Amino acid sequence: MSIDLKSRFLQVYDSLKSDLIHDPAFEFDDDSRNWVERMLDYNVPGGKLNRGLSVVDSYKLLKQEELTEDEVFLACALGWCIEWLQAYFLVLDDIMDESHTRRGQPCWFRLPKVGMIAVNDGVVLRNHIPRILKKHFRGKAYYADLLDLFNEVEFQTASGQMIDLITTLFGQKELSKYSLSTHQRIVKFKTAYYSFYLPVACALLMFGENLDDHVQVKDVLVEMGTYFQVQDDYLDCFGSPEVIGKIGTDIEDFKCSWLVVKALELADEQQKKLLNENYGRKDPASVAKVKELYHTLNLQGVFEDYENKSHEKIIKSIETHPSKAVQEVLKSFLGKIFKRQK
């Protein structure tokens, strides 16, 4: 990722933000304009920006020649729509999970003057996406396809979040509900579509492709998204909070994490009893017992093995694709996440 592209990408953010806080469809005053600007700056550009930048990278690899200034702007704008979608999900997700930190700072709803206004802010973030698309893509042949794509992916993600939440309903802590297939279903819908398929699908639409012709690409990206979430589950427990920017709470939150699913597969009856008694409890002693069991079961080794096998399998799937340019797009995506630490 060149520094040039990242700084160009951030310039496009400033331009989109300026459009939104001067949107003629609403009568802004100083208070509302300042609120939206502060809310955007706090929640939208703070992450690694991988999803957004991937649209530009993918489009470049598909086009295989220098992009015009206009193409760079449009690819960046689509990338930012994904970052806006991500911000909308995270603002609401943090409230539902009662999280404390996100990207190394307090969650938006935890700020003294924000609180539950964050719910409406989430709705505002979601509504910014069609505003951006309308302003910059309305005249394009693929405009309707873009709107469809964002709506479809939002529905899939919200439905994945729903399975995640109802599987972890408070007062119904049943570890027996947790299996690899439940985990994969949550991950496929909650993470893989918006984090992996959406950026490449945006680039393909911009390039003039029909998404119905790229089901294989979708399948590979969903597989990659599953691998990414397993990494996330692993880092939640074994990653360093300073590096990942948040304190993992999957154990306390009774999450259907890959680690607990694997632990249930490998544990003997005594160890399962320990898991049932301690998983999903907020007190540090219970969390420590679960982590200790993860170490005893060598889940670090099990994860390493999974990581290497997944990488091999995904590479094989990619190499069956007829287009070398599409292969490059998929391999560059995989390269960004393989053996990541955050």
Curated annotation (Swiss-Prot):
- Return the SUPFAM superfamilies for the record: Terpenoid synthases
Q: Which GO terms describe its molecular function?
A: (2E,6E)-farnesyl diphosphate synthase activity; dimethylallyltranstransferase activity; metal ion binding
Q: Where does this protein have coiled-coil stretches?
A: none
Q: How does activity depend on temperature?
A: Optimum temperature is 40 degrees Celsius.
Q: Which reaction does it catalyse?
A: isopentenyl diphosphate + (2E)-geranyl diphosphate = (2E,6E)-farnesyl diphosphate + diphosphate; isopentenyl diphosphate + dimethylallyl diphosphate = (2E)-geranyl diphosphate + diphosphate
Task: Print the keywords alphabetically.
Answer: Isoprene biosynthesis, Magnesium, Metal-binding, Transferase
Q: Could you say which residues bind dimethylallyl diphosphate here? A: R102, K190, T191, Q229, K246, K255
Tissue-specific expression: Expressed in shoots.
**Signal peptide position in this chain?**
none
Give cofactor(s), names only: Mg(2+); Mn(2+)
Q: In which pathway does it act?
A: Isoprenoid biosynthesis; farnesyl diphosphate biosynthesis; farnesyl diphosphate from geranyl diphosphate and isopentenyl diphosphate: step 1/1; Isoprenoid biosynthesis; geranyl diphosphate biosynthesis; geranyl diphosphate from dimethylallyl diphosphate and isopentenyl diphosphate: step 1/1
Gene3D superfamilies the UniProt entry points to: Farnesyl Diphosphate Synthase
Query: Where along this sequence does the record place binding of isopentenyl diphosphate?
Result: K48, R51, Q86, R103
Source species, domain of life: Eukaryota
What are the cysteine partners in each disulfide bond? none
| Motif placement: DDXXD motif | 93-97, 232-236
Notes on the domains: The Asp-Asp-Xaa-Xaa-Asp/Glu (DDXXD/E) motif is important for the catalytic activity, presumably through binding to Mg(2+).
By what name is this protein known?
A: Farnesyl diphosphate synthase 2
Q: What is the lineage of its organism?
A: Eukaryota, Viridiplantae, Streptophyta, Embryophyta, Tracheophyta
